A protein has these predicted regions:
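Phosphate-binding loop that captures ATP/GTP phosphates
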Residues: 142-205, 209, 216, 223
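Glycine-rich phosphate-binding loops of nucleotide-dependent enzymes
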Residues: 195, 238, 364
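Conserved catalytic-core segment of NTP-binding enzymes
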Residues: 69, 221, 225-228, 232-332, ...
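Walker A/P-loop phosphate-binding motif and the immediately C-terminal alpha-helix
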Residues: 118-156, 276
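N-proximal, solvent-exposed amphipathic alpha-helical segments enriched in charged/polar residues
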Residues: 2-38
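Flexible beta-alpha connector loops of hexameric P-loop NTPases
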Residues: 58-60, 201-214, 260, 264-267
């Protein structure tokens, strides 16, 4: 018995359903949900014309979206040919889209105390302790667990996250995020949404020499204008020390939790304690210490402690003084060639060499963070005495 030929209406409905599986690579939502599909026209003989509207002129994802639309429509049984007419949203349609993406919320910081997103600021006292490397690996490890993760690189003067996440080209230049009106769409790498001041400079050697007010405005804009969507975890890679950016993050996100990165060296531990103390002064909770560069495993199985021992435990002990709940050492990350190579290549070690001891340690730290209870500072508990 011959298979029934679908009617034009049935074919159009099937094509529209297939297009619902096409995801905008920047907004990370179906193109049908974003009103990017303005119509599906079924013509004689199974030819289909799809009216596709992009968000802006020069959309960097245009070729990808058009290809995915063509493939999705062509995969529907009964479709003989696919034509895609590409246009651009008018200002009114684009404004309606940005309003819908914001879910009707007024423009402002997305990550308030009552949001469902867990905000973790990764800080250190000294530079060069591997804070950014720890941040990106934790982000990717959490994303591999199925969480929706974003990273904000607020180390404005020493940005490195785009390179560590593989977002830079052969010249070290990161892609400039797409703007939809006042909304900034963060690039995605390894299933993590990322934004950094390094995406707004034209040359990797450009020195960003801003003072307090500009730094505060930058942090505020990243937290206000960048569309991250619904995240489970947002990690902030802070600059080392206790300067303007740390203070701004404390003011803008007083409910954020803080993760302190140090090395086993006593000098690093001394300074790391200060970064935790400053975080507490703004109401933030220190959830733990990560000891990086903990040792180098030798061929005979012995460990060479290039930076000494005990810095992580000492930092945690100092930050625990006078606290009801002790600050734990969440883990120690050993020195590792694959860890360094992964950073240089833009493939974090938890993804590129998951069996390496450093990757195992970082993944365990990420898992431990997910099992820790989120702080209630600043959150409404929804209790009623009536």
């Amino acid at each position: 018995m011959a298979e029934a030929v679908p009617t034009d209406e049935q074919l159009g409905t099937a094509v529209l359903a297939a297009l619902g599986r096409v995801i905008d690579p920047e907004i990370r939502r179906p193109v049908t949900e974003l009103d990017m599909i303005r119509g599906v026209d079924v013509q004689p003989g199974g030819a289909v014309r799809v009216d596709l509207q992009l968000t802006i002129v020069g959309c960097p994802a245009a070729d990808t979206i058009e290809r995915d639309v063509r493939v999705a429509a062509g995969s529907v049984p009964g479709v003989a040919a696919v034509e895609v007419d590409v246009s651009v949203m008018d200002p009114a349609t684009r404004a309606a889209l940005t309003e819908r993406l914001r879910a009707g919320r007024p423009k402002g910081i997305q990550f308030t105390a009552d949001s469902l997103t867990r905000v973790i600021a990764v800080t250190s006292g000294k530079g060069g302790v591997g804070k950014s490397t720890v941040t990106v690996n934790l982000a990717v490890a959490l994303a591999r667990r199925g969480l929706r993760v974003g990273v904000v690189d607020v180390d404005v003067h020493g940005f490195s996250v785009p390179g560590l996440m593989g977002l830079t080209d052969e010249h070290g230049v990161a892609p400039r995020p797409t703007r939809v009106d006042s909304m900034i769409l963060p690039p995605v790498a390894h299933d993590v949404k990322v934004v950094s001041i390094g995406m707004f400079v034209d040359d990797v050697s450009t020195a960003v020499s801003w003072r307090g007010p500009m730094l505060h405005r930058t942090v505020n804009q990243f937290l206000t204008d960048v569309f991250f969507g619904d995240l489970d975890v947002l990690l902030l890679d802070l600059p080392p020390g206790t300067g303007d950016v740390a203070i701004s993050v404390g003011q803008l996100l007083p409910h954020a939790e803080v993760l302190v990165v140090t090395t086993p060296q006593a000098a690093a531990a001394d300074v790391a304690e200060r970064s935790g103390i400053v975080a507490r002064q703004t109401g933030q909770r220190v959830i733990g210490v990560v000891e990086n560069m903990a040792g180098l495993v030798q061929p005979d199985g012995s460990v060479l402690h290039l930076f000494g021992e005990g810095g992580g435990a000492e930092t945690a002990a100092r930050l625990s003084r006078g606290q009801d709940t002790p600050v734990p050492v969440l883990g120690s990350v050993p020195l590792s060639v694959p860890l360094r190579e992964g950073g240089d290549a833009g493939v974090p070690v938890v993804l590129g060499a998951p069996e390496d001891p450093s990757a195992v340690a970082l993944t365990a730290i990420a898992d431990r963070i997910t099992t820790m209870g989120r702080g209630l500072a600043g959150r409404k508990l929804g209790l009623s005495l009536s």
